[in-house]
Structures are given as C-alpha cells and as structure tokens.
C-alpha cells in the first residue's frame, strides 16, 4: 500500500537521518547534506530500489523559479535532485542537496544505482558538476573539445551575442520569393 506523501517523507527522512522534509504537491521530498548524499542513497537502496532520475538546478539569484530574491545576499548554489522509488508499493521520493558553485562536486551514486550513470554524465557535461567516484564521466552530447557548460546560467549563448534578446523580428524572404512588404496596407492609400 502506498503511504501518503507526507508520511513517506517523514519516514524516509528518519531513515536517512534528516530533519528537513516536505510533501509539496503530493511529492515526498527529503533534503540531505551533501556529505551524506551517497550514504542516503545506500541506505535507501533496499527500500527504494528503482532509480528514476537525477537532475541539477543552477540557482543564481532566485529563491525559487521566478521568485525575486529575498535579499541581496541570496546564496548562489547548485541543487542536485534524485528520484528513487519502489515499483511494488508505488512510492517515490525526491532527495535533494545543495553544493557550492565554486567547486561543484558530490559523491557519485552510480555504484549504488546503475541507472544514475548517464544522468550524472549529463549533469557533469551540462552543468560542470564533478561526480566523485563515477566510473566514466565522458561526454554524452557535446564534442570533447567543447568549452563550457551550457546549462549554467553564466554560459553565454552565441545567438544572444550576435543578436541581443529579445531582438527584433526579421522578415526574410524564402528563396525565389520577393521580400514581404513591411508597409502598413492602410497607409498605401
């Protein structure tokens, strides 16, 4: 039988030794210290053997997506999240932790959950996070010579260097067509 999310969050928090948990929007979420990230996954491995996903968020000045900063001293950080589940009971829990942006690294959970392998590789490639102990942090998407981490908020988009956002609408003709008129038909009189 599936526990309700708030009971599940409280139970999992007790198992991993955390006092920070919630069940917002029907999802059990437990915060763990980054030093205990691997240990939390090892502890939950038997109870929650299904690894669903891992992701990272670049929190710059927002407290939450779209929220204005509460003060000028908002801590810039990366949040790492993973979702574990039990397919027999239907339970899912999201574990999350914060890591510093100046040296973004955290223990790899790929040795506990094989499914975390590619998720960690993607986060390493796109966000520049070092998953310590990962067996193969090679690129998945980008060429090996690519410089930078495209999902970081500090990553400069070339298209925005060439044409500032939001830019103007360029009306270009299709090949073998005349350029569309930019005159107002009412002014043509």
Model-derived features with residue positions:
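Terminal low-complexity/charged segments
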Residues: 1-189
């Amino acid at each position: 039988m599936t526990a309700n999310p708030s009971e599940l969050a409280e139970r999992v928090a007790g198992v991993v030794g955390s006092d920070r948990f919630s069940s917002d929007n029907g999802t059990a979420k437990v915060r763990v210290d980054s030093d205990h990230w691997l240990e939390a996954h090892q502890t939950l491995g038997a109870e929650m053997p299904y690894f669903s996903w891992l992701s990272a968020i670049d929190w710059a000045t927002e407290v939450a997506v779209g929220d204005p900063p509460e003060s000028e001293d908002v801590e810039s950080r990366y949040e790492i999240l993973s979702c574990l589940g039990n397919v027999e009971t239907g339970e899912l829990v999201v574990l999350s932790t914060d890591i510093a942006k100046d040296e973004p690294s955290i223990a790899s959970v790929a040795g506990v959950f094989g499914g975390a392998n590619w998720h960690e590789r993607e986060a390493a490639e796109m966000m520049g996070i070092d998953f310590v102990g990962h067996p193969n942090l090679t690129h998945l998407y980008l060429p090996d010579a690519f410089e930078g981490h495209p999902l970081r908020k500090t990553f400069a988009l070339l298209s925005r260097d060439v044409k500032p956002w939001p830019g103007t609408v360029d009306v270009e003709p299709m090949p073998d067509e005349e350029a569309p008129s930019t005159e107002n038909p009412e002014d043509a009189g």
